[in-house]
A protein has these predicted regions:
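Flexible "arm" and connector segments at domain edges
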Residues: 1-68, 72-127
Length: 127
């Protein structure tokens, strides 16, 4: 069952959250959320995070697949720094979310919707 992690996660999102949340843009928003949470867990300050966002948005927009490759390389490097593997952390998280009750998943989604973090409107400044 762990052979195709992408399909496993896609199926989980589709069946537990909803097909409308499988779009590339929605997945990028969730990736941003998780990346910020990881940075926060690693003691990256608010000011450092905001400075990084200003730096990135001050440059030309990249190609999604190349940027996703960069995310993958950075995550692999983070795994190496923590003496773990991507497979290990990914499987542990997939098993954790698959075990979550549906009402807990939907509650988390509702909180994100209330905060306008799901399907939010783009800022004209950075569109």
């Amino acid at each position: 069952m762990e052979d195709n992690l992408e399909k496993r996660v896609e199926d989980w999102v589709s069946t537990r959250i909803g097909v409308q949340y499988t779009s590339a843009k929605e997945r990028a928003m969730r990736l941003l959320e998780e990346a910020v949470e990881l940075a926060q867990a690693e003691n990256i300050t608010w000011n450092q995070a905001v400075a990084q966002i200003h730096y990135v948005y001050g440059r030309s927009k990249g190609e999604p697949e190349q940027e996703a490759g960069g995310v993958a390389v950075c995550l692999l490097g983070w795994c190496a720094a923590h003496k773990t593997t991507f497979q290990e952390i990914a499987l542990r998280e997939i098993e954790r979310i698959e075990a979550k009750p549906l009402n807990e998943i939907r509650g988390s989604l509702a909180r994100k919707q209330d905060a306008d973090l799901v399907h939010g409107e783009e800022s004209a400044e950075h569109a």
